[in-house]
Amino acid sequence: MQVLTNTKFETVAFQWPAGFYSDGIHIGLRRHKKDFGWLFSKVPASAAGTYTTNQFQAAPTKLTKQMIDQGHQLQGLLLNSAIANSCTGEQGWQNALQEQAWLANKLNVAPNLIGVASTGLIGAQLPMDKIKNGLPQLTPTKSDAVTYAVLTTDQHPKTVCVQCELSGQLVTLTGFAKGSGMIHPKMATMLGFVTTDAQIDGPVLQDMLSTNVDQTFNQITVDGDTSTNDMVVTLANGLADNPSLQAGTTDYDIFNQALHYVLGQLAKQIAADGEGATKLVECNVVHAATTFDGQQIAKAIVGSNLVKAAIFGEDPNWGRIISTIGATDADIDVATVDIEMNGVLLVQQSLAVDFDMAAVQATLRDNQIMIDVDLHHGTASGQAWGCDLTYNYVKINASYHT
């Protein structure tokens, strides 16, 4: 067994956990790039998911949620980009069911162990002939090709892999995600997948995933729009042979920290790859009255178009930040707010302080920007991630036609 460091977990090169296989290919949904893939475990896996709150929830999202809610297990997922299969009516629903049946037949498992995930253009029907013809081309590999098959306007895949020891057994967690635009999640974000060979019951995994998604994926924003297809799914097949994880144990805490890290890293990678983005923006709020207040303020700041535009312009415009704070319904003291940008104090007790404008502007040329807010009004905190707003965001979305 690999000897781990003294940390609870460590990052490692991309690899699938024991028993997981995948593939990603091109079947003509996109012009040239990979657009179709699968991910499966050789044994049924405990499954958990979080899903978009958009009322026009897409057929694949509804279907996968139904399967996980019914049995807390999945064994395979069929994935595609380019076409979202959203707002497609009864035909879209039947197409999702057909995809499920085809993959179940290919894997020789019950249909209720199969989920479906789609992303892309809303309103178009899937070309089922291409899906059917593409299925035989999918092979069980250990490559990362599937991480490319779900991309749309993304510049690159988002992946992370960590390992930890649970009761002496080496456990791997591997996650990948897609997302660049239409990112302002509520309960989930774009498409995200985490696989692990840890042993954990589905309901326990669901509680853990939901809590961690709220603190990570739900705290990023690129453009304030919540997709119809947002979904985060976690699969745990138990092949690491650790004792089943239970709340209140050391193993549970270690795994929970590892899962939080994986989700957090994927969330930050998505924010950094926002459409047209040149800078990742992180906001930390401390001494808030409640965690909700801290999270609300942090997300409002990174989501403010005025703040995002100022960061693109490399302008430490703290007035836009404090105005955004005041526009929330958070419980604050308007006389006690401190604001720092990249470690430089701009505002103390809600009043301007002298600072070296040129020095601050120089730090804003970096591709990672940190905004720190101290409310001096409690003991809670919040964190959120976003990106700058650039000319290219408008260009990309103006040229994305139906």
Curated annotation (Swiss-Prot):
<dbReference type="GO" id="GO:0004358">
    <property type="term" value="F:glutamate N-acetyltransferase activity"/>
</dbReference>
<feature type="binding site">
    <location>
        <position position="402"/>
    </location>
    <ligand>
        <name>substrate</name>
    </ligand>
</feature>
<comment type="similarity">
    <text>Belongs to the ArgJ family.</text>
</comment>
<comment type="pathway">
    <text>Amino-acid biosynthesis; L-arginine biosynthesis; L-ornithine and N-acetyl-L-glutamate from L-glutamate and N(2)-acetyl-L-ornithine (cyclic): step 1/1.</text>
</comment>
<comment type="subunit">
    <text>Heterotetramer of two alpha and two beta chains.</text>
</comment>
<keyword id="KW-0055">Arginine biosynthesis</keyword>
<feature type="binding site">
    <location>
        <position position="152"/>
    </location>
    <ligand>
        <name>substrate</name>
    </ligand>
</feature>
<keyword id="KW-0068">Autocatalytic cleavage</keyword>
<keyword id="KW-0012">Acyltransferase</keyword>
<dbReference type="InterPro" id="IPR002813">
    <property type="entry name" value="Arg_biosynth_ArgJ"/>
</dbReference>
<protein>
    <recommendedName>
        <fullName>Arginine biosynthesis bifunctional protein ArgJ</fullName>
        <ecNumber>2.3.1.35</ecNumber>
        <ecNumber>2.3.1.1</ecNumber>
    </recommendedName>
</protein>
<keyword id="KW-0511">Multifunctional enzyme</keyword>
<feature type="site" description="Involved in the stabilization of negative charge on the oxyanion by the formation of the oxyanion hole">
    <location>
        <position position="119"/>
    </location>
</feature>
<feature type="binding site">
    <location>
        <position position="397"/>
    </location>
    <ligand>
        <name>substrate</name>
    </ligand>
</feature>
<feature type="site" description="Involved in the stabilization of negative charge on the oxyanion by the formation of the oxyanion hole">
    <location>
        <position position="120"/>
    </location>
</feature>
<dbReference type="GO" id="GO:0006592">
    <property type="term" value="P:ornithine biosynthetic process"/>
</dbReference>
<dbReference type="Pfam" id="PF01960">
    <property type="entry name" value="ArgJ"/>
</dbReference>
<feature type="binding site">
    <location>
        <position position="275"/>
    </location>
    <ligand>
        <name>substrate</name>
    </ligand>
</feature>
<feature type="binding site">
    <location>
        <position position="178"/>
    </location>
    <ligand>
        <name>substrate</name>
    </ligand>
</feature>
<feature type="site" description="Cleavage; by autolysis">
    <location>
        <begin position="188"/>
        <end position="189"/>
    </location>
</feature>
<keyword id="KW-0028">Amino-acid biosynthesis</keyword>
<dbReference type="InterPro" id="IPR016117">
    <property type="entry name" value="ArgJ-like_dom_sf"/>
</dbReference>
<comment type="function">
    <text>Catalyzes two activities which are involved in the cyclic version of arginine biosynthesis: the synthesis of N-acetylglutamate from glutamate and acetyl-CoA as the acetyl donor, and of ornithine by transacetylation between N(2)-acetylornithine and glutamate.</text>
</comment>
<dbReference type="InterPro" id="IPR042195">
    <property type="entry name" value="ArgJ_beta_C"/>
</dbReference>
<keyword id="KW-0808">Transferase</keyword>
<dbReference type="GO" id="GO:0005737">
    <property type="term" value="C:cytoplasm"/>
</dbReference>
<feature type="active site" description="Nucleophile">
    <location>
        <position position="189"/>
    </location>
</feature>
<feature type="binding site">
    <location>
        <position position="189"/>
    </location>
    <ligand>
        <name>substrate</name>
    </ligand>
</feature>
<comment type="pathway">
    <text>Amino-acid biosynthesis; L-arginine biosynthesis; N(2)-acetyl-L-ornithine from L-glutamate: step 1/4.</text>
</comment>
<keyword id="KW-0963">Cytoplasm</keyword>
<dbReference type="GO" id="GO:0004042">
    <property type="term" value="F:L-glutamate N-acetyltransferase activity"/>
</dbReference>
<dbReference type="GO" id="GO:0006526">
    <property type="term" value="P:L-arginine biosynthetic process"/>
</dbReference>
